[in-house]
């Protein structure tokens, strides 16, 4: 079995101005607070759920 968890690279491409508070806090939880900032996170269910909530602000790449 392959127990390797793939990583995803998430880049914020749009501003959080005008978004709901829960979406802003989701971005902060992902480690994003500025446009064009990127983070590499493990591809887990909780991270995918957070990304799904703010996918209109992000660019997602598999690694």
UniProtKB/Swiss-Prot annotation:
HAMAP family (UniProt xref): Ribosomal_uL30_B
Keywords from the named record: Ribonucleoprotein, Ribosomal protein
Originating species: Rickettsia prowazekii (strain Madrid E)
Record-stated family: Belongs to the universal ribosomal protein uL30 family.
Lineage, highest ranks first: Bacteria, Pseudomonadati, Pseudomonadota, Alphaproteobacteria, Rickettsiales
Descriptive protein name: Large ribosomal subunit protein uL30
GO cellular component, one term: cytosolic large ribosomal subunit
GO biological process: translation
Subunit structure: Part of the 50S ribosomal subunit.
Top-rank taxon, per record: Bacteria
InterPro entries: Ribo_uL30_ferredoxin-like_sf, Ribosomal_uL30_bac-type, Ribosomal_uL30_ferredoxin-like
GO molecular function, a single term: structural constituent of ribosome
Short name of one Pfam family: Ribosomal_L30
CDD domains: Ribosomal_L30
TM region positions: none
């Amino acid at each position: 079995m392959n127990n390797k968890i793939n990583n995803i690279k998430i880049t914020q491409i749009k501003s959080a101005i005008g978004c709901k508070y829960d979406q802003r806090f989701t971005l902060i939880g992902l480690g994003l607070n500025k446009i064009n900032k990127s983070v590499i996170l493990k591809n887990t269910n909780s991270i995918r759920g957070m990304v799904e909530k703010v996918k209109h602000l992000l660019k997602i790449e598999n690694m």
